[in-house]
Amino acid sequence: MYYFYSPEMFVPYQWGLERNVSYAYMPYNSFYYGDYISSLPYALHVPQNYKIQMKEEERGSWTPFSWVEKYAYAFSGPYNKAEVALTFDDGPDLLFTPKILDKLKKHNVKATFFLLGENAEKFPNVVKRIANEGHVIGNHTYNHPNLAKVNEAEYRNQIIKTEEILNRLAGYAPKFIRPPYGEILENQLKWSTEQNFMIVQWSVDTVDWKGVSADTITNNVLGNSFPGSVILQHSTPGGHLQGSVDALDKIIPQLKTKGARFVTLPSMFQTSKERK
């Protein structure tokens, strides 16, 4: 059975679809069609042949539900805890990442940062600051490829190369992976699960990379978050992200007022931040 939560009170109600799962997989901007799920709010392509096995080239951003059940793979956390997780992709940089860290310190909130290996190499001191201030670091590949278009060897290279960089700078090998664009293939999920990684997508997309205002981002998050929400923001070098930074001063206090607790992904999924 699916559960969704009212953003007003964090009260569960039945969404109306039957499925025996322990997590909530009904974020507002994920699309559901037959046995497939898409995490991209701007993915307008709806597969016409979902009743049969879709070919990889036709699937695009659509993920079979079975992957969530078979692998260490999630879009959101447990629905029975009033927890939400802030996550920031594509950093670090010298402009927005420090501003985000300042805001998080101001509100006494810990978050998860999915870093690119090439940016971590450029800005090692920012990586160290993220780790030293108690935030969790995740693996976002080395240079942000579409993983659905790379072979198995290149996928593994992207992950392991980045892991080595982050381990050297942060002091541990991150357990969590987020695939760029939300794109990943089943063989990649299988290998990652076997290697004790966990792949976490998102359930609320702020679309902050478009340079939208703080009010737009705030309304998006407040209107569509529920217990277990994984919120996607960015700390992209050269991005237009001031609205995303400023929105934190509104999102954090208002969600706390609703009863939400801000946690890192290891806390949400009750596992280690480190791949062991």
Which ranges hold each PLM region?
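Metal-dependent polysaccharide deacetylase catalytic core of the NodB/CE4 family, i.e.
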Residues: 40, 81-84, 94-96, 105-238
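Histidine/acidic-residue-rich catalytic or RNA/ligand-binding cores of hydrolases
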Residues: 212-215, 242-246, 274-276
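Catalytic grooves of carbohydrate-active enzymes
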Residues: 226-238, 243-266
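N-terminal pre-catalytic segment of deacetylase/amide-hydrolase enzymes
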Residues: 1-86, 93-99, 106, 250-253, ...
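Acidic/histidine-rich helix-loop elements
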Residues: 56-61, 151, 239-240
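Glycine-rich, phosphate-binding/catalytic loops in enzymes
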Residues: 102-104, 194-195, 247-250
